[in-house]
Amino acid sequence: MNKEEFIHYCKEINIEINDKMYDDLLNYYELLVKWNSKFNMTSILEQNQVFLLHFYDSLCLSKYINLNRECTLCDFGTGAGFPGMVIALLFKNVKVTLVESSQKKCQFLKHIKEIFDLENVTIICSRIEEYGINNREKFDIVTCRAVTSIPIIIELATSTVKVGGLLAPLKSNCLDELNNKSLYKEFNLKLIDVYKYNLPIQNSKRTIPVFKKIAITDKKYPRNYSTIVKKYKK
């Protein structure tokens, strides 16, 4: 995805990319490549691929969830900042909390925050299920990208979503993971929509299931990670 394609396809999802925005993303890309040689954060390093598979893919959330407002967003398992840091860079009105367990990746995220002077970004070096114990019902939107299966995501992160807020993970094709209505009831979630689309150029399938939280999460959740995985892994 070259510059012209990136600007064009962002416009199709109602994001107007100006020169500064593009230059900031280009700088982000260059820093990613530089730090990746030390910390191995991504296997995708070619510029056009990063703009498509990391930057554009991250921004697709804004097509389906209103980010043009004052709101709080948590991105867990963010890695090198996808989708949360990209959203924070282009949507300064969104207060973004990035939760990442890797100290090395958190170092990179802190560097990006400093380089771009992102006052709307908070970086937490923790596992989401540990962070969620003392940060309950906190965020308007909670998201992640390609972290794990939907049932595991639900238990890991639902406690951090405000009542009335949204859990909206970015996934590839996950329709076979969306049939557990008893699980939604257990976590006081309502599946309000499933957005399906294809990434441009590659035409690879993407899915964003959107859950609305209708009541507080039972305090026994989330459990520790090994217990969660044992219950939901096939």
What are these model-derived regions, one by one?
Residues 2-68, 74, 104-121, 224:
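Class I SAM-dependent transferase core
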Residues 19, 45, 125-127, 193-195:
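Short loop/edge segments at beta-strand edges and connector loops
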Residues 32, 87, 171, 211:
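Residue-level signal for inorganic ion chemistry
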Residues 48, 59-148, 154:
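Conserved SAM/SAH cofactor-binding pocket of Class I
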Residues 91, 161-163:
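Helix-to-beta-strand junctions that scaffold the AdoMet/dcAdoMet cofactor pocket
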Residues 129, 149, 172-176, 199:
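Short "lid" loop at the C-terminus of a central beta-strand within the Rossmann-like core
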Residues 164-174:
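Conserved beta-strand signature within the Rossmann-like core of class I S-adenosyl-L-methionine
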Residues 181-234:
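SAM/dcSAM-binding transferase cores
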